Swiss-Prot record:
Keywords annotated in UniProt: Cellulose biosynthesis
UniProt-recorded name of the protein: Protein BcsX
GN (gene name): bcsX
GO molecular function terms noted in the UniProt entry: hydrolase activity, acting on ester bonds
UniProt-listed CDD domains: SGNH_hydrolase (cd00229)
Record organism: Komagataeibacter xylinus (Gluconacetobacter xylinus)
């Protein structure tokens, strides 16, 4: 039994039946930090969350470190797959990456080195069949934003997104779009293109709900190592913002039954 509960019970026995003492003791019980910690840990109990995405969820000290840890602390069962350079349709139609990295993490298990062999993302339908998630969280956007090119092919992005959302089917989903970066010649990411892509995705990802990554953080606040991939500190800030933005919806969805097999 937590020490705070034991102390509360002793105080109740010695306090008699006076109403003020009971009210004061109850207030102490409700604000005990140790007990609040137990309540927080149960916030997402019963929820199975499947996270998929590109390089932002592939490497140690990226969102692969932040999101599974934080959602597991809230009581969720979390399974995460990241494949560097993957686009939305790659999670439906097999398309090997260039060997820049792939990762799988169950819960908050230790993060090992990514698999650097060229590999296709596992099909989303097989992942749903395997893990029976209540919710799929998609972390994608940068790989489809055509950074360094004159324009985004919106028809192509539309096809990419619709291919994935159709395959996700009746399973609830949350799509997290790109956030800010820094310009570098390597990728050519600009705030203007990030804003354009984030806004376009908002109207594309239904029936998934959408989290605009550029709305979570202040423009110019994200530090990167190469223009796109954030520093560990900025990944922590971005990840924490994603958690806070999605917790209310995840809490509502935790009691929803997993979608039937398609």
């Amino acid at each position: 039994m937590p020490a705070g509960v034991a102390a509360w019970r002793r105080d109740r026995r010695h306090a008699g039946t006076a109403r003020p003492a009971r009210c004061a003791d109850t207030a102490l019980f409700r604000t005990n930090p140790q007990l609040e910690k137990y309540e927080m840990n149960a916030l997402l109990a019963g929820l199975t969350l499947l996270i998929i995405g590109d390089s932002h969820v592939t490497f140690k000290d990226s969102l692969l470190s932040v999101l599974p840890d934080e959602f597991t602390k809230q009581g969720a069962k979390v399974v995460t797959y990241g494949v560097c350079s993957s686009t939305a349709a790659d999670w439906v139609v097999p398309n090997p990456n260039n060997g820049c990295g792939a990762a799988e993490r169950v819960g908050d298990a230790p993060i090992g080195a990514p698999d650097m062999k060229p590999a296709s993302p596992p099909p989303i339908t097989s992942l749903i069949e395997k893990w029976h998630p209540n919710v799929v969280m998609v972390i994608l956007g940068d790989t489809m934003a055509a950074y360094g090119q004159n324009a985004v092919s919106k028809d192509w992005v539309d096809e990419q997104v619709k291919t994935l959302t159709y395959a996700i089917g009746k399973t609830a989903c949350i799509w997290v779009g790109p956030t800010w970066g820094q310009f570098s010649p390597r990728y050519g990411k600009t705030d203007q293109r990030a804003t354009e892509m984030a806004s376009f995705l908002k109207g594309e990802v239904a029936p998934c709900s959408y989290v605009d990554g550029t709305a979570l953080l202040k423009q110019g606040s994200v530090n990167t190592i190469d223009g796109i991939h954030a520093t560990p500190e900025s990944y922590r800030v971005w990840g924490d913002a994603i958690v806070q933005a999605t917790l209310p919806e995840l809490e509502k969805l935790k009691d929803a039954p997993p979608a039937p097999a398609q």
